[in-house]
């Protein structure tokens, strides 16, 4: 019934299976996966409100509460995605990690958010790169013909 309503409203739909597990997002800056954040929304889904309203009380854990071995695997996958997709500069890859330790890459964002509420600047800050340094790095990197 819901699908029929949606098909009446939209021309096409994509249906994906829900993967139960932790939401981990990993930043790649240049030639290094610098770190990750675990997203713990208080809402049922990590939607617009959970991302951008302080009243949503979404928790960001840096580093994520996973084993160091699992975190290293995730960072390697994020970096590999960055390279395979021929990305330059900054990317953010989003993952789901099941209780069994299975890693699912959901997407790689080639233009991740760069606001004060965005995850890449937050991850960079926790690894010693404040917002000004991050933006300056991006400007300098944009001038490199690789």
Stretch-by-stretch model annotation:
Residues 117-120:
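Beta-alpha-beta core module
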Residues 17, 26-28, 82-114, 124:
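Conserved metal-phosphate-binding beta-hairpin within the catalytic cores
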Residues 38-91, 122-146:
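Active-site "cap" helix and flanking loop/linker of ATP-utilizing ligase/carboxylase catalytic domains
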Residues 1-76, 99-104:
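Phosphate-binding site of ATP-dependent enzymes
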């Amino acid at each position: 019934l819901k699908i029929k309503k949606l098909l009446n409203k939209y021309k096409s739909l994509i249906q994906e299976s829900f993967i139960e597990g932790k939401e981990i997002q990993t930043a790649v800056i240049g030639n290094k996966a610098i770190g990750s954040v675990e997203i713990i929304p208080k809402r049922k889904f990590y939607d617009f409100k959970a991302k951008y309203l302080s009243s949503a009380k979404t928790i960001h854990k840096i580093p994520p509460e996973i084993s160091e071995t699992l975190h290293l695997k995730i960072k390697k996958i994020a970096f590999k995605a960055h390279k395979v997709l021929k990305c330059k500069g900054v990317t953010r890859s989003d993952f789901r990690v099941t209780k069994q330790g299975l890693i699912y890459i959901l997407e790689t964002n080639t233009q991740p958010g760069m606001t004060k509420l965005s995850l890449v600047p937050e991850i960079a800050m926790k690894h010693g790169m404040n917002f000004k340094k991050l933006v300056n790095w991006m400007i300098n990197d944009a001038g490199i013909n690789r």
